């Protein structure tokens, strides 16, 4: 189930997202957040967290850095600074070329 959900999000990222204007107010983007939540918390809790994040991502909020926390929550990550090194490492030291 988890692989199926991640696959669906990847299809969205590859084929649908490039056609739409960028609107996500968070880093990482909502689709990346969904994948990270699915990997970290499994299909059910990860899906719930990802949907909660998509609902939070709207024009009436400030946005900002909001990585997936290590525990289940439907709220914004209260301590994104704890994940700052991990985010920087992923963004700048990726093995992808």
Swiss-Prot record:
The protein's matches in InterPro entries, at most eight in alphabetical order, are given as: Membr_insert_effic_factor_YidD
Q: How does it sit in the membrane?
A: Peripheral membrane protein
Q: Which GO terms describe its cellular component?
A: plasma membrane
As for subcellular location, the record says: Cell membrane
Query: What's the protein name?
Result: Putative membrane protein insertion efficiency factor
List the keywords (alphabetical): Cell membrane, Membrane
Q: What protein family does this chain belong to? A: Belongs to the UPF0161 family.
Q: Which NCBIfam families match?
A: membrane protein insertion efficiency factor YidD
Query: What lineage does UniProt assign to this protein's organism?
Result: Bacteria, Bacillati, Bacillota, Bacilli, Lactobacillales
| Role description | Could be involved in insertion of integral membrane proteins into the membrane.
């Amino acid at each position: 189930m988890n692989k199926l959900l991640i696959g669906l999000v990847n299809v969205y990222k590859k084929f649908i997202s490039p056609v739409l204007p960028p609107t996500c107010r968070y880093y990482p983007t909502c689709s990346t957040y969904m994948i990270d939540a699915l990997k970290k918390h499994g299909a059910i809790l990860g899906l719930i967290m990802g949907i909660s994040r998509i609902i939070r991502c709207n024009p009436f909020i400030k946005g900002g850095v909001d990585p997936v926390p290590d525990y289940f929550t439907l709220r914004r990550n209260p301590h994104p600074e704890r994940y700052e090194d991990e985010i920087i490492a992923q963004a700048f030291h990726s093995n992808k070329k």
